[in-house]
Amino acid sequence: MNGSKDLPEPYDYDLIIIGGGSGGLAAAKEAAKYDKKVMVLDFVTPTPLGTRWGLGGTCVNVGCIPKKLMHQAALLGQALRDSRNYGWNVEETVKHDWERMTEAVQNHIGSLNWGYRVALREKKVTYENAYGEFVGPHRIKATNNKGKEKIYSAERFLIATGERPRYLGIPGDKEYCISSDDLFSLPYCPGKTLVVGASYVALECAGFLAGIGLDVTVMVRSILLRGFDQDMANKIGEHMQEHGIKFIRQFVPIKVEQIEAGTPGRLRVIAKSTDSDQTIEGEYNTVLLAIGRDACTRKIGLENVGVKINEKTGKIPVTEEEQTNVPYIYAIGDILEGKLELTPVAIQAGRLLAQRLYGGSTVKCDYENVPTTVFTPLEYGSCGLSEEKAVEKFGEENVEVYHSYFWPLEWTIPSRDNNKCYAKVVCNIKDNERVVGFHVLGPNAGEVTQGFAAALKCGLTKDQLDSTIGIHPVCAEVFTTLSVTKRSGGNILQTGCUG
């Protein structure tokens, strides 16, 4: 008997990953530890303006990394102003150089892109700068930027394609507007800017653009920071407004026209009210769209292998083990239905998936109590449930909210932003006042939130917070002295850093 004819054809790879972002790269490197043959396909479709970038995905190239660096540029401007009150004779004529900042940011990103390629090579992961598209069971077509096609087969596939910014679908949006994909490498200062949207991307970009001295307006359709705690969102909006950012509420653009070409040029934006027939128009140098993001799942041949997606959102439903309805195809990151769109979540999910597939692990990604930070001028860190979600889940009578304003010591000398920083914990009364939501608005909110996130994972209660001795004088100590409940209506204003 000739057994060789009955053996299935071997696959080219054990695992092919579509998408070279944070999640895909984490999964690739982890799978390679188990001596698996792994390939990563990554391709950046240029923006309407032609912007493209290297390996690493959104976070590294057009997301968290450049955003935090530009946020830092804005904070340094504030620090320069504060420094005069501390005895530094800073000349009044300090100016910001956009080109110098973007060059420095892009140089750093370039070094990260190179580092990822080196890491893949060292781990013997095959990387191709090519667009992946399923063509049949266990088979994928890879098309490079010259249009050359190759077919590869694999035992398993991981979809980690991420999301891209959404456009409005109005006259002039793709011709004249930019998105966050373009902003961080924009070769000229954007000048007077209209930011369209109320997402965290919109508010973060508006914040640092205003922080480096630009005239910024934010056009909002309805509420700020949908999905986040609305009490915190409104406090962020108020602070931004007090610091010179203008808000146009309940309006949406219906047309963008070019008045004059240039770098930047001049644009006319016509907008319509969401609750009447009123239209308004304004003139800006740059229009930045930040109205949301869409999953990159519709043009990768999922219909050729039977992977189900949510037709409305493009998101992929998966099991607790990130498995799609097709057993050999998995998905992680921003494209998952009902999961958090955060880089560290994708990284964790990618690593754990590889460990389950190849290392005998049974540990699944925990999507509960994930900390996050919005890097607005006044940073907002949170972990767990918003106040609204807690009330919805446990009932208003079973939720106790402890809160307080606070004033960072460093801000008392320049006498700025008194009673703007705010701390809040949301507790479940029925469960020994377990802390189910943690919220802080203030400097270094991400650094503050990270440690408390570990405590929430361990089942932190209000009693445990109260019995913790604070570090003095720091912002985070406010969480060890919260005594006023929201329902009491008691005074939460602070007169100094020591309460």
UniProtKB/Swiss-Prot annotation:
ISGylated. InterPro entries: FAD/NAD-bd_sf, FAD/NAD-binding_dom, FAD/NAD-linked_Rdtase_dimer_sf, GSHR/TRXR-like, Pyr_nuc-diS_OxRdtase, Pyr_nucl-diS_OxRdtase_dimer, Pyr_OxRdtase_I_AS, Thioredoxin/glutathione_Rdtase. Its cofactor is FAD. GO terms for biological process: cell population proliferation; cell redox homeostasis; mesoderm formation; response to oxidative stress. PROSITE patterns: PYRIDINE_REDOX_1 (PS00076). There is a cross-link at C497-U498 (Cysteinyl-selenocysteine (Cys-Sec)). NADP(+) binds at residues 166, 198-204, 221-222, 226-228, 292-293, 315, 341. It catalyses: [thioredoxin]-dithiol + NADP(+) = [thioredoxin]-disulfide + NADPH + H(+); H2O2 + NADPH + H(+) = NADP(+) + 2 H2O. The active site is at H472 (proton acceptor). Keywords: Cytoplasm, Disulfide bond, FAD, Flavoprotein, NADP, Oxidoreductase, Phosphoprotein, Redox-active center, Selenocysteine, Ubl conjugation. FAD binds at residues 22-23, 42-43, 58-59, 63-67, 131-132, 161, 200, 334, 341-343, 472. Its EC number is 1.8.1.9, 1.11.1.2. It is an enzyme of class 1 (oxidoreductase). The modification Phosphotyrosine is found at Y131. Homodimer. Belongs to the class-I pyridine nucleotide-disulfide oxidoreductase family. This is Thioredoxin reductase 1, cytoplasmic. It comes from Bos taurus (Bovine). The lineage of its organism: Eukaryota, Metazoa, Chordata, Craniata, Vertebrata. The gene is TXNRD1.
